[in-house]
């Protein structure tokens, strides 16, 4: 059966998720996560897309990406293929690494964007030793939101989301962290219950 066409807008903002096949960890160690972020930075410079948030976990990763005129299928294919080549060579394996190509969903509103950002940054709570200190997790963009200087690869544009809050930067950081805590305490019926991506496959 043919795949449903991916819904795309070259000026849209997307929730993108990548996941490894079931028996494989996508990131076995922090060196793998570092390599993936290097590749993300490489292709960001080439395609000029913007990243508003990310969280790299064990078997999967989430991103908020503004395509900024680029075709998400093209740059995600480049990123995933490059990482799979690195991974297979490093671990002496062959075959597919990713489950499907990637999942994507257009962000329809500012309120959805804020909830999505909170959802993605709260993913770190499921990592051992980070349930009560998600802001300490190194492979999430939350650290950049709370300390803009903490953005060594220049990957993340925090201004788009933070500008939805207060003009005062310190107050904005406080308000954003309060949003995360509110999301964590009131998850029922929120975005985390509705991330199905069921119609978002490439052909």
Ranges and model annotations:
Residues 56-60:
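Short Gly/Ser/Thr- and Asp/Glu-enriched loop/turn motifs at secondary-structure junctions
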Residues 1-53, 66-203:
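Short Pro-Cys-Gly-centered "Cys-loop" motif that presents a nucleophilic cysteine in a tight turn
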């Amino acid at each position: 059966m043919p795949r449903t066409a991916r819904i795309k807008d070259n000026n849209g903002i997307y929730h993108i998720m990548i996941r490894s096949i079931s028996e494989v960890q996508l990131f076995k160690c922090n060196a793998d996560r570092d390599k993936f972020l290097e590749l993300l930075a490489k292709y960001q410079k080439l395609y000029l897309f913007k990243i508003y948030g990310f969280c790299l976990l064990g078997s999967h990763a989430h991103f908020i990406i503004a395509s900024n005129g680029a075709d998400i299928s093209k740059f995600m294919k480049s990123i995933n293929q490059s990482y799979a080549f690195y991974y297979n060579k490093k671990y002496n394996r062959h075959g597919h690494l990713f489950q499907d190509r990637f999942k994507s969903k257009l962000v329809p509103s500012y309120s959805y964007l804020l909830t999505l950002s909170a959802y993605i940054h709260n993913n770190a709570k499921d990592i051992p030793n980070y349930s009560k200190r998600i802001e300490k997790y190194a492979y999430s963009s939350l650290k950049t939101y709370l300390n803009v200087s903490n953005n060594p690869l220049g990957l993340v544009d925090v201004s788009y989301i933070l500008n939805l809050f207060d003009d005062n930067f310190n107050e904005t950081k406080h308000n954003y962290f309060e949003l995360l805590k509110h999301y964590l305490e009131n998850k029922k019926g929120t975005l985390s219950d509705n991330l199905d991506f069921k119609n978002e496959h490439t052909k």
